[in-house]
């Protein structure tokens, strides 16, 4: 099947797009050669699909046209007078549909008289012609619009299995129980981006970048005395001109004798590197239930097995930018660097905001993996014969 979509938000020649899809499945358990396994395998099906959808990414209803505004040109005089003129704040955004093409192959099964059943899917999702802002030379006199300049590929899988059964007699009544396990993972990578210089500046992407990458310094302990602090005044001068005992020391990864971000490019990232990734990995859920003699109890757990998190918030650091932004607890006080506590978790107390010791770094990168009890329900089903007496 397919769909043909149009949007008045795009220019006339980019307004329409066709998005087809197709799927196929094969129930192997229905084939004659499979009959010998039918006592164990109740159902086995493989399936595959491919399909495309469109994302409508625009700013406003007519972003493909420039908006011209009247403005007094205060920087120029003509014949001794300030003249009025027209200003084009940005170039038109000549964009069209983002296209999301998903390929999926899956397996459905049920075993042991439908007591064990589940499904597995592996997919590749290509997002083509992603809309991003274009950087233009400053000499142009206006900012660039948006264009379809990026592609991204997401590869992932999803697994779900359920065991559901009944024990016929437990203290005079049957006991029903079930357990469901779900697990999934994905990673997304930029496969095309208009970034010829490999800039690592905020908001920029580059080909080969894994979504969620965290760039930062590698922590190399604390500055422990005034002599070492004097050395860091030179080695780490691009971060701050003055260092003290209890401040963080960073590793010189490229061996050039100074700690800095280089040119903030892939070819010259200075002493920074990828130290983690904020993408949640290996999401899981557990659902269990027991029913007996009218009582039911159900519980749902969910979580993430792997995720890195850089928080950098005032709440995390405790001592922060002045008394009004600080949130100091006893934990912060007990775990802050002093001469008597040189291996503490936090650096010396200071109020320099995100300077010196608060650069993105390995030491304070948090493990954001978790498990939580999302829901638990206890219920009782009133017997019908009781209700009939009401």
Each language-model region and where it sits:
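Short loop/turn motifs that connect adjacent beta-strands in outer-membrane beta-barrel proteins
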Residues: 29-44, 112-115, 166-177, 190-195, ...
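Outer membrane beta-barrel strand-and-loop segments of large Gram-negative receptors
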Residues: 92-96, 122-167, 218, 250-263, ...
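Extracytoplasmic gating/loop element in the C-terminal half of outer-membrane beta-barrel translocons
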Residues: 7, 304-390
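Solvent-exposed loop/turn elements at secondary-structure boundaries
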Residues: 35-99, 117-152, 194-200
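Outer-membrane beta-barrel and related beta-rich outer-membrane complex signature
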Residues: 10-16, 36-38, 52-67, 130-134, ...
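Surface-exposed extracellular loop regions of Gram-negative outer-membrane beta-barrel proteins
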Residues: 1-10, 15-30, 100-102, 111-118, ...
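Conserved small-residue
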Residues: 62, 147, 166-278
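Outer-membrane beta-barrel signature, preferentially recognizing the C-terminal barrel domain
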Residues: 52, 73-117, 145-172, 208-215, ...
């Amino acid at each position: 099947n397919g769909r043909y979509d149009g949007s008045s938000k795009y220019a006339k020649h980019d307004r329409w797009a066709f998005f087809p899809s197709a799927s196929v499945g094969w129930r192997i358990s229905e084939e004659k050669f499979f009959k010998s396994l039918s006592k164990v395998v109740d159902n086995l099906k493989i399936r595959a699909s491919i399909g495309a959808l469109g994302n409508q990414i625009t700013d406003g209803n007519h972003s493909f046209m420039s908006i011209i505004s009247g403005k007094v040109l205060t920087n120029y005089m003509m014949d001794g007078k300030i003249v009025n003129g027209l200003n084009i704040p940005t170039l038109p955004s000549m964009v069209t549909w983002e296209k999301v093409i998903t390929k999926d192959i899956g397996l459905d099964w049920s075993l042991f008289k439908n007591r064990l059943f589940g499904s597995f899917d592996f997919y590749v999702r290509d997002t083509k012609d992603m809309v991003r802002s274009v950087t233009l030379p400053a000499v142009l006199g206006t900012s660039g619009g948006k264009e379809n300049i990026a592609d991204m590929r997401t590869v992932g899988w999803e697994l779900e299995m359920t065991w559901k059964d009944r024990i016929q007699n437990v203290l005079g009544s049957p006991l029903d129980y079930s357990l469901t396990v779900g697990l999934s993972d994905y990673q997304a990578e930029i496969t095309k981006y208009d970034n010829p210089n490999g800039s690592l500046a905020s908001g920029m992407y580059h080909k080969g970048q894994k979504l969620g990458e965290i760039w930062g310094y590698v922590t190399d302990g604390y500055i422990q005395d005034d002599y070492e602090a004097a050395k860091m005044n030179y080695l780490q001068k691009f971060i701050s001109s003055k260092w003290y005992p209890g401040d963080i020391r960073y590793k010189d990864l490229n061996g050039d004798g100074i700690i800095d971000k280089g040119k903030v490019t892939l070819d010259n990232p200075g002493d920074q590197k990828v130290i983690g990734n904020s993408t949640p990995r290996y999401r899981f859920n557990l659902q269990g239930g027991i029913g007996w003699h009218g009582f039911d109890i159900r519980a749902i757990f969910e979580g993430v097995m792997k995720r890195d998190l850089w928080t950098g918030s005032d709440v995390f650091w405790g001592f922060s930018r002045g008394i009004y932004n600080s949130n100091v607890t006893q934990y912060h006080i007990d775990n802050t660097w002093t001469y008597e506590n040189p291996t503490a978790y936090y650096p010396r107390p200071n109020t320099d905001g995100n300077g010196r010791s608060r650069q993105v770094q390995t030491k304070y990168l948090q493990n954001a993996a978790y498990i939580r009890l999302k829901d638990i329900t206890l219920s009782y089903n009133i017997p019908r014969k009781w209700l009939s007496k009401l």
